[in-house]
Structures are given as structure tokens and as C-alpha cells.
Regions:
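C-terminal partner/receptor-binding element of secreted or periplasmic proteins
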Residues: 67-91
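Exposed beta-strand-loop-beta-strand "reactive/processing" segments of non-cytosolic proteins
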Residues: 20-64
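Mature, folded catalytic cores of secreted/periplasmic enzymes
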Residues: 9-12, 21, 53, 57, ...
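Context-gated lysine
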Residues: 8, 13-15, 43, 65-69, ...
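Short, non-transmembrane alpha-helical segments in secretory-pathway proteins
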Residues: 1-26
């Protein structure tokens, strides 16, 4: 999806993952009302270490379909009750 591709471009440009070739982007449309989500997950197998049967989530990016603003839980200590941050982070 174009949304997942956009997130992938930001993640790679900002070097938010150690091994970009070992990461997948899972697009979940309308995960929340008017919010699309892209889960950034570990890709295992081939040259990537880890159990090929699993794809643990690293973090997620939440995209508002109306405003196209993005937030992520990349910096949240508590994935459930924490506060999402603007994505990409403004340095």
C-alpha cells in the first residue's frame, strides 16, 4: 500500500531499524475509526535470524486518513497506556 511504502521510506531514511532488510511492513486499514495502521515487524528466515514462524512487532505507525498526520508508539514504555509521539519525530 502507498501508506506502508511511505512509512517504510521514513523508517529507512531515519534509520529507525538496525537491519532494514529484516523488517516487514504490515498494512492494517481502518484499524481504528479513520486510522490506518502500519505494523513494523521483524522478518525472520533467509539471511535474517530468528524463527521464520514468528514476526514480532517492533512498533506501529498510526495514520489519520483525513489529516494524513502520523503518530507512532516507537518511544512508548507502555504500549497500552503510553502516549503516541509524532512520526517521524521532529529532531
Amino acid at each position: 500500500s502507498p501508506v506502508a511504502q511511505q512509512v517504510k521510506n521514513i523508517v529507512e531514511k531515519q534509520k529507525l531499524v538496525r537491519e532494514p532488510q529484516c523488517v516487514d511492513y504490515v498494512y492494517i486499514p481502518d484499524s481504528e475509526p479513520s486510522i490506518d495502521v502500519v505494523d513494523i515487524v521483524e522478518k525472520h528466515g533467509g539471511s535474517c535470524s530468528g524463527d521464520p514462524q514468528t514476526a514480532p512487532r517492533i512498533f506501529s505507525v498510526f495514520v489519520n486518513k483525513k489529516t494524513h498526520k502520523m503518530e507512532s508508539d516507537i518511544d512508548m514504555d507502555d504500549q497500552v497506556n503510553g502516549t503516541r509521539s509524532v512520526f517521524p519525530a521532529v529532531k
